[in-house]
Amino acid sequence: MKILITGGCGFIGSNLAIFLKQNIQNAKITSVDNLSRKGSSLNHKILSKKKIKNFKLNISKVTTFKKFQRFDLIIHCAAEPAIEASRNKIDEVFNSNLIGTFNILKKCAKDKSNIIYLSSSRVYAMENLFRLKKGISIKENFNVENYKSIYGFTKLSSELLIKEYSYLHKIKYIINRVALVSGPWQFGKEEQGFVSLWVWRHLNRLKLNYIGFEGKGKQVRDVLHIQDLCELILLQIKKLKKINNKLMNVGGGKKNSLNLLRLTELSRKVSKNKIRIGSIKKTSPYDVPYFVTNNSYVTKLYKWKPKRNLKKIITDLYFWMKPNKNILKKYF
């Protein structure tokens, strides 16, 4: 099987490329990435060692893939992932996330390649999320009509574009609305990948802040281990002939949900370090107080559930970071 992974030097893309090469016999994995994010150059070297080819390519600026062979499957991970970019990098977000998808779909249509798309839980309407009672998890039929951020808009628009191309060109697709994912090889920042950042700061005894919602650290998210996501996508590939043209939520679920206070507690236990944590009351216009994924549909389709709990996620991050501190410090 010939597979193209866009954003293959990103956190999800690189983990996925290595995992699929190890778990699909005779798979030929190709990665494309614009190498614009911190850490992507390091992941590029790792992929090379695993004999996975990566081509430096900005998919939003490419209208043809003449130098590439036909692929059986394209796994579309490439995106500008930071939600805060919706405020000050609108052109970049739009081009990377929507025009990039359009260019990929033209390749799919030409070659009759199937597509697995990594969308986002950010497609859901923020106004409705603010009214949500705690304890309720988000299903696929939750409101997507109201404002959500430019980032969320481009992800939702990409979903709709994929469906149109599927109908017009008979392309099989899977759309995963992925929530918060973490694990080794995530170079976290405050606005994206904060679980990884939390563990890194504890390991190195560096200050953190509880940001937004009065700075109390009580906002809730569910977290999915990167290996659980990779295992799901492997299942989706194996079952694509029978299960296709489906859209589903994918996340850690209620059992893997936590607030920042709990994340601090777990990070302290694993690192055995207590650090100073400040408080910033001002809330980002794109932050929500509560989001937990309902996995019932993806579980029904694939009999899949996350296997790795929060402690496992934190522990795996810590024991990846600790022996590699000197290499990793310039990426955090």
Q: Which residue stretches match the model-derived regions?
A:
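C-terminal substrate-binding subdomain of Rossmann-fold SDR/epimerase-dehydratase oxidoreductases
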Residues: 15-16, 57, 203-332
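NAD(P)-dependent short-chain dehydrogenase/reductase
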Residues: 128-137, 160-237, 263-270
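A short beta-to-alpha transition loop/helix N-cap that caps and shapes the active-site region
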Residues: 38-40, 125-127, 185, 258, ...
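N-terminal Rossmann-like NAD(P)+-binding domain of SDR-like oxidoreductases, especially those catalyzing
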Residues: 1-179
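Short, solvent-exposed loop/turn segments at secondary-structure boundaries
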Residues: 87-89, 185-190, 287-289
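Short, surface-exposed alpha-helical segments at coil->helix boundaries
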Residues: 41-44, 159, 196, 257-261, ...
